[in-house]
Amino acid sequence: MLWVGRRAPAALEELAAKYAKRLSRHLPLAEVRVRPAAGRQGDARRALAEEAAAVRKHLRPGDTLVVLDERGRERTTEQLAGWLAERRRLGRTVFVIGSDLGLDSSLKNEADELFALSRMTLSHGLARLLLLEQLYRATDLLAGGQYHRGSLG
């Protein structure tokens, strides 16, 4: 998982670490924070291009690039679990979360998939926490765990 931005508030960081630890029991997880571009206020386009270049340095040939974007495809937990099961057989999947400026359109165009956690715009810290929790929930579901209880109605 690659995310562009500064560290989130301590409470979000603590919860993210909790879910990252749980998730690592089900699948290999590496998180990389990409620093936001310097001088971002003056030229947002340049900053986004620099941040995209920094993200690309962490990508390998054959990676499945999944960019988080509110216009992306939404999934239920069960759909995410099925999708993850398929992805695990096909190789490394890299999720990318943009900065407060978003992500450069070139990176979105290169993505194998745009994925939405919500139609709302989320801070990168909250998006990271939600993604970690949902990935843990989906992988625990695949492992037959009890964390996901699904709809009771």
What are these regions (language model features)?
Residues G39-V94, L101-K108:
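Portal/gating segments that form or line small-molecule/metal binding sites
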Residues R35-A37, R71, M120:
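Short, solvent-exposed coil/turn elements at secondary-structure transition points
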Residues S105-G153:
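Structured adenosyl-cofactor binding patch, chiefly the S-adenosyl-L-methionine
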Residues M1, V66, G98, L131:
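Conserved RecA-like P-loop NTPase ATPase core
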Residues E13-A16, T77-E78, K108, R128:
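Conserved strand-to-helix beginnings and helix N-cap segments that scaffold or border functional pockets
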Residues R7, E74, D100, D104, ...:
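Gly/Ser/Thr-rich beta-alpha loop segments that engage phosphate groups in nucleotides
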Residues K18-Y19, G82-A85, D112-E113:
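Glycine-rich, phosphate-binding/catalytic loops in enzymes
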Residues M1-L65, D140:
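RNA substrate-binding interface of SAM-dependent RNA methyltransferases
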